[in-house]
């Protein structure tokens, strides 16, 4: 028996879940559905309980359905286009990652291939192809490039990513006692990459330490840019994303609530990452506390208006200038001026 279309189930569930039970049944009866889809949707709606948001309930009800999807479509040695799969490097909520190498004889190239979970409908596959074109144009020294993409013989989308050498951000920081200045420089590299992507109208939506690699020279590379966007079933009229994939602990409140999100969601995630990078010792500084607080406000409108402004405040802190997040009056600004000019001020005082 054919499985119900996953993308359509998502759409129908979202339409019906907030209706009263009687209206749900009436709408369900009026829909032109095959028996399997109707029964699957009815089970999902019947299991809906509690006060969670529609998006949260959707994730919970779809999880059981997703578990039944065959994950054995591809294996080491399989060929996807011009790429031959190597060993599996890992598996996560979004799919499995394989090492890969190019085998068409044009030139030698190593890559990482992420095979995404699920089998989208033809309409969703068309959206995925369009989104891949956008992501493939992201060219920044701190963003891992999207090289290629397609679908497996059984219809699962895959992405071919630049292979990046380095350690996860959290592992990199735990293995070496980096001073504050170097930690902030790493963070500013991340901000530069995210700001660049935002200028191309691409939001990451899943920024976290495991998606940030640091090489032996202290250079940052952001992974999985736009993967959450690719997994989304659609985009709103104004181009902002209604995302459904996220990592608890780093996701913004609006992302967790299933609301429409934009650049402010990435600002929030960067604020959480900055807090973790600084640890208890460095984050006690009042200016840094203010920066983190501003970036992680619950209300997106009260955060930094852009990642660029967040990075700018970090830059001001590094050089002893007042930070926007503090606001502050003449006393605060005066104290920062004295810090910047301390040697000269101290010298003058000796002669007064």
How would you name each of these model-derived features?
Residues 165, 194-195, 199, 209-216, ...:
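C-terminal lobe helix-coil module of Hanks-type protein kinase domains
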Residues 1-87, 111, 180, 241, ...:
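Short N-terminal regulatory/linker segments that flank and modulate the kinase catalytic core
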Residues 117-137:
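AlphaC helix of the eukaryotic protein kinase fold
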Residues 99, 108-117:
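Glycine-rich ATP phosphate-binding loop
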Residues 148-150:
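A short, aromatic-enriched beta-strand patch in the conserved N-lobe beta-sheet
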Residues 96:
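Conserved N-lobe ATP-binding subsite of Hanks-type protein kinase domains
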């Amino acid at each position: 028996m054919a499985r119900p279309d996953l993308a359509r189930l998502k759409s129908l569930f979202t339409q019906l879940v907030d209706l009263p039970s009687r209206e749900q049944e009436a709408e369900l009866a009026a829909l032109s559905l095959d028996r399997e889809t109707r029964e699957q949707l009815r089970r999902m709606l019947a299991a809906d309980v509690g006060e969670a948001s529609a998006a949260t309930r959707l994730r919970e009800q779809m999880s059981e359905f997703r578990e039944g999807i065959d994950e054995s479509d591809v294996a080491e040695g399989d060929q996807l286009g011009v790429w031959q799969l190597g060993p599996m490097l890992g598996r996560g909520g979004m799919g499995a990652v394989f090492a890969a190498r190019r085998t068409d004889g044009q030139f030698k190239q190593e890559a990482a291939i992420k095979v995404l979970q699920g089998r989208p409908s033809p309409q969703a596959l068309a959206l995925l192809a369009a989104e891949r074109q956008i992501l493939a144009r992201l060219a920044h020294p701190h963003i891992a490039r999207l090289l290629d993409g397609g679908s497996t013989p059984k219809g699962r989308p895959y992405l071919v990513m630049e292979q990046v050498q380095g350690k996860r951000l959290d592992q990199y920081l735990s293995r070496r006692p980096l001073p504050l200045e170097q930690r902030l420089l790493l963070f500013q590299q991340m901000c530069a990459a995210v700001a660049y992507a935002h200028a191309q109208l691409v939001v990451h939506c899943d920024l976290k330490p495991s998606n940030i690699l640091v090489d032996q020279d202290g250079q940052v590379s952001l992974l999985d840019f736009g993967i959450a966007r690719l997994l989304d079933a659609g985009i709103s009229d104004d181009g902002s994303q209604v995302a459904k994939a996220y990592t608890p602990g780093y996701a913004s409140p609006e992302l967790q609530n299933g609301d429409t999100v934009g650049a402010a969601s990435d600002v929030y995630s960067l604020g959480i990452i900055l807090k973790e990078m600084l640890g208890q010792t460095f984050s006690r500084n009042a200016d840094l506390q203010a920066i983190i607080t501003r970036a992680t406000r619950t209300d997106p409108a009260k955060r930094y208006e852009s990642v660029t402004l967040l990075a700018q405040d970090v830059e001001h802190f590094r050089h002893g200038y007042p930070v926007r997040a503090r606001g502050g009056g003449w006393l605060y600004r005066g104290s920062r001026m004295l810090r910047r000019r301390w040697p000269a001020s101290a010298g003058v005082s000796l002669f007064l």
